A protein has these predicted regions:
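His-Asp-centered metal-binding catalytic motifs of divalent-metal-dependent phosphohydrolases/nucleases
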Residues: 3-40, 47-58, 99
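Divalent metal-dependent phosphate-bond-processing catalytic cores, especially two-metal-ion Mg2+/Mn2+ enzymes
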Residues: 1, 12, 22, 42-44, ...
């Protein structure tokens, strides 16, 4: 495990949010981040996290809200759908999980899902996104051989 690489992906995955844009949905910040990192000379091993962190389970439909319902007409839709179809690396899965557990503090995935429901509402894909979030957490529990939350003592304060 390359810890510096994992940290770097964590630092840059949401870099597209630094740009101003009027479009709604996941695509704007994902694509702006991807293009920005590429413009700096980095390859897809780095830039790809800007896209892949927004979609669980290699599935363009696995999002936490329906703000992207109209994005099938987005110029980037086909590119993103194909791009995320490849198996995610362990690093990309770690960033997905961390993105789901962290806001201003570390949360259980259950509490993070409630946070997303509160802020975005319940949509057609919400149940699917919650199921995949729980599967991702269970994947890491299995990989570790114990409950992932044991790595985060501060989570006990949030239970």
């Amino acid at each position: 495990m390359n810890i510096d690489y994992a940290k770097t992906l964590g630092y840059i995955h949401d870099i597209g949010k630094k740009f101003k844009y009027n479009e709604k949905g996941v695509f704007p910040h994902a694509m702006k981040g991807y293009k920005y990192i590429k413009s700096l000379g980095y390859d897809d091993d780095y830039a790809g996290i800007c896209i892949k962190h927004s979609f669980l389970n290699n599935d363009i439909d696995c999002i936490s809200n329906d703000r992207d319902e109209t994005d099938k007409s987005n110029e980037n839709y086909d590119f993103v759908k194909q791009y995320i179809s490849k198996e995610y690396s362990i690093y990309e899965k770690i960033i997905n999980l961390c993105d789901l557990m962290c806001t201003t503090k570390v949360l259980t995935v259950d509490k993070r899902m409630i946070d997303l429901l509160y802020r975005h509402g319940v949509y057609a894909k919400t149940h699917y996104h919650i199921e995949e979030t729980i599967k991702l957490k269970e994947y890491f529990d299995s990989l570790l051989g114990y409950n992932l939350y044991d790595l985060f003592p501060e989570i006990k304060e949030n239970l």
